[in-house]
Amino acid sequence: MRELTMRLLILFFFLTISKLACANYVFIPMDAKQSNHLKAYGIAYWILKNDIEVDWLLNYRGGSFMCKYQPAIQNELVVRGVSFEIISDAQANSIITEIASPAVNYDLMKLEKYPKIAVYTPKSKQPWDDAVTLVLTYAEIPYDVIFDDEIMKGDLPKYDWLHLHHEAFTGQYGKFYG
């Protein structure tokens, strides 16, 4: 019995290793199978920040992400509680082929660089006072808060993405509290 248990453990070990050896991609679903959508966006940002390209599969299973497998990525996904699948080259190629079909409204966007993000909001606001900063903070996506002084100093070219609240330019800012 003990010998059989040992053989089964060894077999399990080698099957696990061979599965990982064939696991060439990480697939991060963004449909109902995703346990934490916001953290998944943060993971995509984290992967880009580590100089690894990410394929954003537009309209495919909710706009899923896919990238080359690396143990560090798998570890980060587990730590952040993000649902993922380890898939083979063949499975990744099948997804890419399906996306390329003119019969579907899917597209693949290759992300190569993480954006430097700024949010235009008063410095006195806490992350929970603003929906955008709340989401970015929760997703663990770094951002800078800028306001009028930074714009007047000419700091806008430092950023790839600037989020502006429409009420800041329509005279509606502060009406909620008012």
Name the predicted role of every residue range.
Residues 1-9:
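Bacterial N-terminal signal peptides that target proteins for export
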Residues 21-23:
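Boundary at the C-terminal end of the N-terminal hydrophobic targeting segment
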Residues 52, 82, 141:
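Short phosphate-binding/catalytic loops that engage adenosine nucleotides
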Residues 80-113:
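Short N-terminal or domain-adjacent regulatory/targeting segments
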